[in-house]
């Protein structure tokens, strides 16, 4: 069964979130799953050892409480929900770093600041599921993310004037930003391609008429 036309051109929000949740992120576990800690010959002592059922035994069953490790985001969210870890916010997701990105966007009207491909979706997920793991106030971070997004949207719209039938430069735009633009841009490029083809055809016909004369 084929998908509706509007779903053939873009990812659904659920598909984007699924992709983002399979990316790695750092956590501080609150449990220990490693069966033996190097240099620890005292057995389990007072430390409870957990055994997690998983296909990725290396990552999940090698954790030591309060030692940073890296797991995929969806696992981090499950552990967080059960109060078994704290999620480490990405370095770019602070008020200081976001201020730098906003300033860059304002001073470089023809370029976009370098941000992870999943920055918008990741920020939204962490704001909703791990707000207590941020050092900066959540309302400030939300505001700066919104400011950054609006500035970039304005720059994208201004950049559409350089659109032609074959090419549009979209360096440093995230998956969500491109996904939102894709149907609109695709339609415009199709129209431009039709106009370009028609003009070439008309030019060829004129050349043939001149040659026959």
Swiss-Prot record:
Q: Which Pfam families does the entry mention?
A: PSF2_N, Sld5
Q: Which family does it belong to?
A: Belongs to the GINS2/PSF2 family.
Describe, as the record does, how this protein assembles with itself and its partners: Component of the GINS complex which is a heterotetramer of SLD5, PSF1, PSF2 and PSF3. Interacts with PSF1 and SLD5.
State where it is primarily located. Answer: nucleus
One record GO biological process: double-strand break repair via break-induced replication
Q: Where in the cell is it found?
A: Nucleus
Q: Which top-level group of life is the source organism from?
A: Eukaryota
- Report the function annotation for this chain: Functions as part of the GINS complex which plays an essential role in the initiation of DNA replication by binding to DNA replication origins and facilitating the assembly of the DNA replication machinery.
| Classification via InterPro entries | GINS_A, GINS_bundle-like_dom_sf, GINS_Psf2, PSF2_N
What protein name is recorded for this chain?
A: DNA replication complex GINS protein PSF2
Q: Which UniProt keywords apply?
A: DNA replication, Nucleus
* Annotated GO CC locations: CMG complex; DNA replication preinitiation complex; GINS complex; nuclear replication fork; nucleus
